[in-house]
Amino acid sequence: MDIEAYFERIGYKNSVNKLDLATLTEVLQHQMRAVPFENLNMHCGEAMHLDLQDIFDHIVRKKRGGWCLQVNHLLYWALTKMGFETTMLGGYVYITPVSKYSSEMVHLLVQVTISDRKYIVDSAYGGSYQMWEPLELTSGKDQPQVPAIFLLTEENGTWYLDQIRREQYVPNEEFVNSDLLEKNKYRKIYSFTLEPRVIEDFEYVNSYLQTSPASVFVSTSFCSLQTSEGVHCLVGSTFTSRRFSYKDDVDLVEFKYVNEEEIEDVLKTAFGISLERKFVPKHGELVFTI
């Protein structure tokens, strides 16, 4: 696997020698704006693989995206290859409808240590929950970013990532009450510990998320990509475009239904994706917010 091919894929052309926070931030931002958070393979009759070579070929060679177990695995590899001090971590996603964290470790994230300071790096949570900068691993400190204010807190060895969100304006009244809209201003995102993980720790959940009727990834197709101003999302056949802070403390969220003839063009123009197999959009009853 060629790190230069990875840099070309994400459009990164700056220093690879300075292992500092600025470089880490740039790599994160280039990847999150080039590599979609998506599960389209599952809705094209294909599997989501964990093998790093498969992930590299899928994302770098075929210019696709993936979910956290793939996208953050690739980021972990790239940062390690560059020489950063990295640790793979596992997270438990907050499930809003039942007000609790997942019982299974379903999220992969990365810890990076720079000059004895630890940071959380995650390029694969998607939608308006995606961090745009590494988060300093410190408890109880508001960390304002473009998407929202992020907050890490620690309790008895468990860390919690939360988000304080802005108001949102939806100009099309048809979608004002859409179930895709996040209704909470204060949003819990996930919990994690600092126990080092390896990719094999995620083998069971990688299979479970692709097969269980209880998995939102089975019931819903999604694709999400950060932009310079916000984020694009395609959930089932509904396309949304969010512009962060389009006016003071308000996000603009625009909706559009995409018909079958438009899907291919939307995937190409908004997400840079060209599929090899027929895609069947799906939006089930399980809650999925943007």
Curated annotation (Swiss-Prot):
It holds the Pfam family Acetyltransf_2. Keywords: Acetylation, Acyltransferase, Cytoplasm, Transferase. GO terms for molecular function: arylamine N-acetyltransferase activity. The active site is at residues 68, 107, 122. It is found in: Cytoplasm. It comes from Mus musculus (Mouse). CoA binds at residues 103, 208. InterPro entries: Arylamine_N-AcTrfase, Arylamine_NAT_domain_sf, Papain-like_cys_pep_sf. One of its GO terms (cellular component) is cytoplasm. Participates in the detoxification of a plethora of hydrazine and arylamine drugs. Isoniazid, 2-aminofluorene and anisidine are preferred substrates for NAT-1. No activity with p-aminobenzoic acid (PABA) nor SMZ. SUPFAM superfamilies: Cysteine proteinases. Signal peptide: none annotated. Its main location: cytoplasm. Its EC number is 2.3.1.5. The lineage of its organism: Eukaryota, Metazoa, Chordata, Craniata, Vertebrata. PANTHER family: ARYLAMINE N-ACETYLTRANSFERASE 1, N-HYDROXYARYLAMINE O-ACETYLTRANSFERASE. Belongs to the arylamine N-acetyltransferase family. This is Arylamine N-acetyltransferase 1. It catalyses: an arylamine + acetyl-CoA = an N-acetylarylamine + CoA. Substrate binds at residues 106-107. The modification N-acetylmethionine is found at residue 1. It is an enzyme of class 2 (transferase).
